[in-house]
Amino acid sequence: PLAKKDITSIPSQHFRTTEEMLNDFSFLDKDLAYKIVVENTNKVLDMVDEIEVIPDTGGTPFSPRVKSDDEKSYLDCPRVVTDLVYTKAKDWYGDPLPYSIEERLGTELYGDIVLTSIKYDLKDLEGEELKVESFKRLHEVIVNGRDSVFNQVRKYLKETSEEELDDDSLEKKLKASLGGVIGAGFDPIYLIAQRLVKHSNDEGYLVGSRGSVGSSFVATMMGITEVNPLSAHYRCSKCKLSIFEDEDGNPLGATYSSGFDLPDKECPNCHIPLLKDGQDM
């Protein structure tokens, strides 16, 4: 309406105080005006129940519960997310997973502290032995589930703390130390997104996810986005070989910002064209 030039005066539309409302009803009897403005409005207020639409979670994300297909029980979201991610990762990159993939998944699911805590437990090892055992343990701890990860980090925090931690202090420190999709409580949100995208894809509609989701390798492995945020690389759909470096040992991502721009290459094992992937996000 403000775009219409014939409007010359605009009525006051602000929320009025009680006194202003009584003044606006001054053409009525004083007692009747008071009843309309004060008494009746309070009667309506008393008839309205207070409900908490979104529970107060103290500043942390509100994580809804996700029902299973039978509509009766609820999904164990951390378990489902972990299974989806590692099933797809193994299908693309093989089993065991390359160290770089294992580390990326661990960081995106729970933060850096999981691998840090494992290396602390293996401080007597060094070199290649430390590397092999660290990533083996990282995989085992995460695949065993959320409780396994929490116990691992909880133990590390307790052993490395400079002060004595009671149970409450330890849990607060654990909560502050963990990050990532599951560690920060975003797993139900990701699972809901995965279901929405899958339903859309099943109906024949492509969903193009970008932004923060497009840069999440976990989201890629869950099928939420078609964007692979890893650096440019080749991967074989048959033997699961992945190549992130050229013949001289230089990262392919240093030359190619997008894996789609990589030159065609044949798998040395299967002699079929390698898939070109990775958008370095």
Task: Give the residues covered by each predicted segment.
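Phosphodiester-processing cores and adjacent nucleic acid-binding clamps
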Residues: 1-281
